[in-house]
Each structure stands twice: as C-alpha cells, then as structure tokens.
Amino acid sequence: MIPQQQPSGMPFHRYQPFKPVDLPDRTWPSKTITKAPRWLSTDLRDGNQALIEPMDTERKREIFDLLVRMGYKEIEVGFPAASQTDYDFVRYLIEEDRIPDDVQISVLTQAREELIERTVQSLVGAKRATVHLYNATSPEFRRIVFGVNREECKGIAVEGTRTVLKFAEQYLKDTEYFGYEYSPEIFIDTELEFALEVCEAVMDVYQPGPDREIILNLPATVERATPNVYADQIEWMSRNLSRREYVCLSVHPHNDRGTAVAAAELAVMAGADRVEGCLFGHGERTGNVCLVTLGLNLFSQGIDPMIDFSNIDEIRRTVEHCTQLPVNPRHPYGGDLVYTAFSGSHQDAIKKGFHALEADAAAAGVPVDEYRWNMPYLPIDPKDVGRTYEAVIRVNSQSGKGGVSYVLQRDYSIDLPRRLQIEFSRVVQQFADAEGGEFSGERIWEIFTDTYLSEGVVGVMAYRSETSEDGEYCISADVRLRGEIREITGTGNGPISAFVDALAGVGFKLRVLDYSEHALSEGGDARAAAYVEAEVDGNVLWGVGISSNITTASLKAVCSAVNRAQQS
C-alpha cells in the first residue's frame, strides 16, 4: 500500500477559497494566441519601486535605452508625484530628448488633485504621454484602508479623471498625443459588477471614441486565484464594457501564486489587448509578470513577439546591473542553466536531435539555422537568443554517454563509435563520482587522452609496408616495447591485420572486432582519428589513435587497445 499523507497541522482554516466567476458560456478556453499583444514595460515604475535600492538616474537611463532598443513602444517611466528622483528622471528624458518619436511614455498617479497636477507638470514638452490614474476598489480596501462606500470610491475615480483632463488641458496643449489609463486597483478582489460600474463612470467623463482611446487596466494586484479565474474576470469585463471598440483592455498580473505568465496568456485569450510587466519579473513581492518569458513563449510557438530578444545575455546583464539583483539560473529563457542538460538521457536525446536536425536541413537544402526547430528538451534554439551551444550539454556525475561524447565532438571533433561512448562514459563516471562537481570540456579531454592516448608498454614509432604479388600485406614496424625500440614484422590482408600479426610475435595477442575512422578537420594536413575495438585476453576494450596519417592512426589505435589491456 502507498503511504498515506497526513494532515499538516497548519492553520489552513484561516483562509477562504476564491469565489469562481459565474461564466458558463466562457469562450477563452477554445481561443489561441495568434499575435503579440501590446506590451507596456513598468520596469522603471513598478519594478523600480520594489528594489532594495531604487535606481538612480543613470541606471534608469540604461534600462530605458535597453527597452527602446528591444522595441517596447509603451514604457511607464515613473511615479513623478511620489519622489523627486522620479520627477527629475521624467524631466531628464524630455529635456534631453531621449524619447524616440514612436515611444509613448506613461506616468502613474494617485487620484489626489495636487499629485495629479505635479504628475501632469512632469510631462510638459513630451510629444507622446499617458497619465495613468488608479484607485483601490476592492471591498477590503474600501472598508479597511480608506473607509469609503461604493459611491465614494467611484467618485474618487470620476473626480480624478476630471482632474487629469483639466490639468492636461492646462499643461499639455502642445503634446502631440495624450493618452489616459485608468486602473481599478485590486481589480482581482473587486466585485465584477462594481469594477464595471467604476470603469463606465470613468469612460463617461473621458468620452473615448475614434482617435480617443482609453486604456482600462485590470490588475491582479495580488494574485489570489488560479489563472482560469482571472481569465473569466477579463472575459466578463470585455463582454460587458460599453464602447469596447475604443477601449484598450490591459492586464497587470502579479506573481504571488507563481502563475503570472499563465494568467497573462489566458487573459489575452479572454480578450486582453495589452499586458503590463517587467523584464525578468521584477516588481513588488514576488514580482510582475515576466515580459521575457511571455515574449519568448510566443516566439517558441512561431509568433513574432514584436520585441527583440536576440541578445538575451546583454538584456540580463543590463537588468542585473541596474537592479542589483541576480537573475535566477533557472529563469525561463534567460537563466544560466536553462539550455543546459546534465542528465545522461537528456544529453543523449539532444545529441541525436542535433544530428537529425543537420540531416533534415541538408536533405531539404536549407541552412541549419533556418530549418524548422524540433529538438528534444530545448524549446527554442539557444542561438536565436544569442547563446552558443557551449553550455547546452555539461557533464557531472549524472551524465551519460550522450553528454560525454557530445562534448568531445563539439570541442575536439572526436566522434566516438557508440560502444566506445558507453565505455568512456563509465570511465568519466568513475572520475565524476570521485571528484564531484561539474566537468569542463578540458577535464573530459584530459581524461580521454590519459585513458586512450598516453604512452604504455607498446607504441608504434615508424612502419614500412609492401604488398606481395598475391595481395598479402606485409609490414615492418619500429615499436617502442617497454622502453626499447624493436622491429617487428607481420602479414595480413591489410595494415591493421598485419600489425596485429606482428604484435603476436612479441607476445601481444588480440582480435580486432570493429574499426572506424574519421577526419578531425578539413584540408591536406588534416589529422585523423581511428578507433579499434579489440578482444585481448578475453576482455573487450577500445583503443584510439590520432595522427596526420590514417594508417599511423590505425596502428596507434591497436597499440592503445593493447596498452589498456595491460593496465586492466
């Protein structure tokens, strides 16, 4: 019988399940995402305010410039009324002409008149700007934090919108495009009908219409429920909002339950037009939804994210430098280890996948880097985001033949026969168990050369050969035998069999079971590798030889097998 789980003893009774949305005819489960939503980066606002040490102007500029290079067209640049630093940064961007003509900056404000005025003042001189107003609408915040009823809460949003329009008319007459965004904060905990009522009241004031879009942003300020519940909420709002064609329905998922990415994707399926988030998921508590993950999830499905992630390491380094927080090595798409396999079975599958990709691309007459990607364990080609294949397969005690042989082939052009892969992986495994940790390509090569290419009791120095009239191959070889140079002779149907015959004359009896060879590089002076599987005194083992002459490499491989038999 399977052991039965026992009660935890934790006070789970203190918590209540989230109420589902009554939406029996929901349509989002049958939808698919076919294009990228509009993106807004809030790295400089929501991301920045959650840092242990908020960014100074120089680091903010680095993030802003990065976002522009990547292709973000909507960037929330601060909370000007909350701090002088934020205000000064907005002024810096405008006065130093740092904002491209096709980028819309956004600033956040609470719904108090003096804060709204200072916020709008910060935008004077901007060509394109959005004011983002919010107030909390959930029952808990109405009752506990602000002590207001529904009508008073709605009144805050309505009056705040009027105030934004008043100051925009006063200060932003020269702005080419003025945008307005409203967020019922804590939307996810707000009664849906009340959230709709507030948004409708805000629209009544703003009067959206042709060329006068309103952004209604519906935040999962604290992630409370499974992503499907958030999707139901978004679909319900999308269905019931009037003037929907003039509304950009935006979502702002947080990651408190660890499902912000799924929540955002389902929300887009449910009708959201726009997603707000941060690079690598920075933000309050567990962070905002990760824009990197969302974008590259689309990319992995053959959809253009409309954002350039082709140098993921530059993006990560910039974010780490500016936030002074590291990106987790396991973070999707951007972490150090996300394209790395240590497990032997994973490594073997990836190695075979690369061989199949090269073969399929060649058969189709298409360059490998343009052929359809279909690779075990790797959802995207690391090269498409600026990574190399160097770290795809790394070797430790969990690695098998696939990983070890892949590293040798990648770094040293050594293409081991399958049975030799198995034999050598056992050798590496012994070292890995003894030494622990990860093995570099250099360490694997060191073990390989010590095992197969080092000097032993016998080594070939030179040889001479001829073929008799009846086709028999005759060899005369100078060999180093236990420190002395000896000449040995033998005959056979080829150089290997003749050399084996010669070795038998000095006491080394072996039977060759398999042989393979390949060039290590191209050109007239290319070296070759030869592999010999032999039975020596009842033991089956492999020998390896490397030389600029393929016959010499073959004879060295025979000597390697003999030497390994002597050591075993």
UniProtKB/Swiss-Prot annotation:
Catalysis performed (reactions): 3-methyl-2-oxobutanoate + acetyl-CoA + H2O = (2S)-2-isopropylmalate + CoA + H(+)
Keywords for the protein's UniProt record, in alphabetical order: Amino-acid biosynthesis, Branched-chain amino acid biosynthesis, Cytoplasm, Leucine biosynthesis, Magnesium, Metal-binding, Transferase
GO biological process per UniProt: L-leucine biosynthetic process
Cofactor(s) required for function per UniProt: Mg(2+)
Enzyme class: transferase
GO MF, one annotated term: magnesium ion binding
Region described as Regulatory domain: 455-568
Catalytic activity, EC: 2.3.3.13
Quaternary structure annotation from Swiss-Prot or TrEMBL: Homodimer.
Function, as annotated: Catalyzes the condensation of the acetyl group of acetyl-CoA with 3-methyl-2-oxobutanoate (2-ketoisovalerate) to form 3-carboxy-3-hydroxy-4-methylpentanoate (2-isopropylmalate).
Family note: Belongs to the alpha-IPM synthase/homocitrate synthase family. LeuA type 2 subfamily.
NCBIfam families: leuA_yeast, PRK03739.1
The protein's name: 2-isopropylmalate synthase
